[in-house]
């Protein structure tokens, strides 16, 4: 199970027949809708397609609405584009004009009052740099510092200058209301500068009755400086390296990224690393070596998710981009020592709440007993979030009651969200969670799981219970000698003669007891015996020969069926039927 999640941007490339289905099957966890482009009708058509596929495939893919935010853009040029030459003058105006090589209208009418002579203005993520020469009430006269082509609606950035524009435009408000009506799961709030911006956005969502969770996009120095308060107010963070790399000295970006990821991991909130992660795959079927390393380093740092933008929205290889992300993530995660990482994370913490301490105890318990999964049960996903915070190596299965919460959990590191029925008691809760996980195929008969939840049942935010449970009933639950495993068909014998007649190399030998006469067979087999003592002949021989042995399996000769394919797990003293 891949632990790092993949966010993919939808667009014209994903509209092609079958592409969205293949992206989901390749591992897309969150679908991002960029509301800086496209109409509500276009976004609704893509969302409807996503809804149909996630129902058909039972895939909890979250839908994320990415707002335009308080950004400044150029308006239109005659012919759609112009060429700017170093040394020429170029004017940005708040008056509505048809743009040409000498001037163009901008979307923010107060920009001339916010900048002054000597300020730098960057167009199209820094492709063209302008120096402000003078300003008037409606115009900013600039000098072009380098050659470049400029197209309609490209971004305008003013590094180091605080713009006095309101955070939420009418367009953003309309987009949020549309998203609430259509059932989006997340909103990625662009250009968040302070906690007040997050609170303003949350107020609009609350008024609309929406349960969308807010991911604050950090894209400028003000957002970076106010990260602690923003992180406290938001549900998660996006390291939006595109505009950040324009607004802030590019040499600072790696340090800022690492710090932001570390802060999010420490408080247990999801963090998305975004922008140009596999940018070359817009045109090429394979990534560059630098891109591979960029993705891997974000995963090593602990990012919850990695994001594809133009690679999937407008690139030539959207499905291949998702598969590439998936492959890099899986290989990188296989190199991480999760036990060591979890110990380091716990060691550097202040006093934990009861809920967080319970979640940490569930992680350490799962690690120490070699559990196959941690099952978290909660109404809003809080328990899963608390467990995910510690980045355990054990798979986290979030057992949930609500489909939207299930989709929202798709963004959290290491969490596999599934549905379960409502439980009215603690015993019922544990049983229902284990049954739901088994039916979903994420745990199997005989697996050992750690279940954590809140008691009393139905009270949110009360994670305080841990229980160890075995999935289903094992064929044998006895005492294992050593820690070896073995698989094979059962060979049930009641005497030495019967062993000599029936036994084949690779069989799992089941006998009432063993003697030295059976040594030639024991050397070739795993052994299950009814002898009860850990100092019995079978246990002694098993240790001496380093063979898998189960002792104390009362009634095994009578209860088990000849030829059944089984797995013998000595560490847990279990014998379970193979699927």
Please provide the spans of the model-predicted regions.
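Non-catalytic helical/linker scaffolds that mediate oligomerization, partner binding
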Residues: 1-579
